[in-house]
């Protein structure tokens, strides 16, 4: 098999399923093995569409768990550019302002790019850019508890607003779009980020694709 110059890994699953934990763990371990300048990580959240033209109260009403909330075409374009050894400017999203900031983060081409997000496997064009995909399969009740703690502590949300959003959009969109997308995953991972075997399997596959 010909080795790849750039391997793209997608880690998908429900909100607060443990995607970030496993993504960060793999990122840190690969940085130690391959070098920090060879590994990049991109959050799908960075590609929420710009809503600066809307008033803040209207931005709060957006369904952020629907595929249309993301500018996946820009993410696809950036992945193609990174594979062609070009640099890209990744948007910076504000969870408190519910839109992109005026800043961006520059990423250069990497040997391994780790994507993390809820709807990475729902978009067929995006799937074509992905070399290995995993779906974190965590029970929804656990996801909800984690989401409550996270959003109240880190995103200045109230318990009522988190529960209302979960009932109106998060759970319905998971059942309609996110859960069905796991059929496209190469690996389905139970127990979230604590699944050591899944992490080791993924790292082995990455090294194989890199020809290591």
Swiss-Prot record:
E.C. numbers: 2.7.1.48
Compartment(s): Cytoplasm
GO molecular function, one term: ATP binding
Binding site for ATP: 13-20
Catalytic activity field: uridine + ATP = UMP + ADP + H(+); cytidine + ATP = CMP + ADP + H(+)
Pathway per the UniProt entry: Pyrimidine metabolism; CTP biosynthesis via salvage pathway; CTP from cytidine: step 1/3; Pyrimidine metabolism; UMP biosynthesis via salvage pathway; UMP from uridine: step 1/1
Gene Ontology CC: cytoplasm
CDD domains on file: UMPK (cd02023)
Primary enzyme class: transferase
Gene Ontology biological process terms in this record: CTP salvage; UMP salvage
One Pfam family in the UniProt entry: PRK
Keywords of the record: ATP-binding, Cytoplasm, Kinase, Nucleotide-binding, Transferase
Similarity annotation: Belongs to the uridine kinase family.
PANTHER family given in the database record: URIDINE KINASE (PTHR10285)
NCBIfam families associated with the record: PRK05480.1 (NF004018), udk (TIGR00235)
Protein known as: Uridine kinase
Organism per entry: Psychromonas ingrahamii (strain DSM 17664 / CCUG 51855 / 37)
